Amino acid sequence: MGQTFEGHLVAEGLKVGIVVGRFNEFITSKLLGGAEDALRRHGASEADVDVAWVPGAFEIPFAAKKMAESGKYDAIITLGTVIRGSTPHFDYVCNEVAKGVGALNMSTGIPVIFGVLTTDTIEQAVERAGTKAGNKGWEAAAAAIEMANLSKELSK
């Protein structure tokens, strides 16, 4: 039988970039808090976590690409909140952000984690930012830690 590879949840020594959309900041700030908490609890130092704020979710892939291209990071976490309104704008933004982050994840050589909430209501977003449904920022950070370590294992 061949090898089994797993990424471990140890953030010590990992350099992580976080891109956060400012639109719906009352939600995204909670996602950021969750991500920072997860990174700290798994051993990351404050000095190893950089945060870039962008105007909204649509701008997230651009900043994530710049961070990835810098070569300084083991993983990038993207955080944002898009809440459905009465126009098709929601669909356009969600599709482009998801495609942009997915493309970066496949092309940059480092994990780029999608932590952007796409919800029908404000209540759903609040639930996913630290109340009933956990904190998706925390979950995105845990995925980033695991994938950064898995990437290192697979590169040996």
From Swiss-Prot:
Enzyme Commission number: 2.5.1.78
Annotated GO biological process: riboflavin biosynthetic process
Pfam families listed in its UniProt record: DMRL_synthase (PF00885)
Keyword Transferase: yes
Catalysed reactions, semicolon-separated: (2S)-2-hydroxy-3-oxobutyl phosphate + 5-amino-6-(D-ribitylamino)uracil = 6,7-dimethyl-8-(1-D-ribityl)lumazine + phosphate + 2 H2O + H(+)
Keyword Transmembrane: no
Keywords recorded for this protein, A-Z: Riboflavin biosynthesis, Transferase
Pathway membership: Cofactor biosynthesis; riboflavin biosynthesis; riboflavin from 2-hydroxy-3-oxobutyl phosphate and 5-amino-6-(D-ribitylamino)uracil: step 1/2
Active site: H89 (proton donor)
A GO MF term: 6,7-dimethyl-8-ribityllumazine synthase activity
This protein's GO CC annotations: cytosol; riboflavin synthase complex
Coiled-coil boundaries: none
Function (record text): Catalyzes the formation of 6,7-dimethyl-8-ribityllumazine by condensation of 5-amino-6-(D-ribitylamino)uracil with 3,4-dihydroxy-2-butanone 4-phosphate. This is the penultimate step in the biosynthesis of riboflavin.
Similarity section: Belongs to the DMRL synthase family.
Self-association and partners: Forms an icosahedral capsid composed of 60 subunits, arranged as a dodecamer of pentamers.
PANTHER family: 6,7-DIMETHYL-8-RIBITYLLUMAZINE SYNTHASE, 6,7-DIMETHYL-8-RIBITYLLUMAZINE SYNTHASE DMRL SYNTHASE LUMAZINE SYNTHASE
Listed name of the protein: 6,7-dimethyl-8-ribityllumazine synthase
Gene encoding the protein: ribH
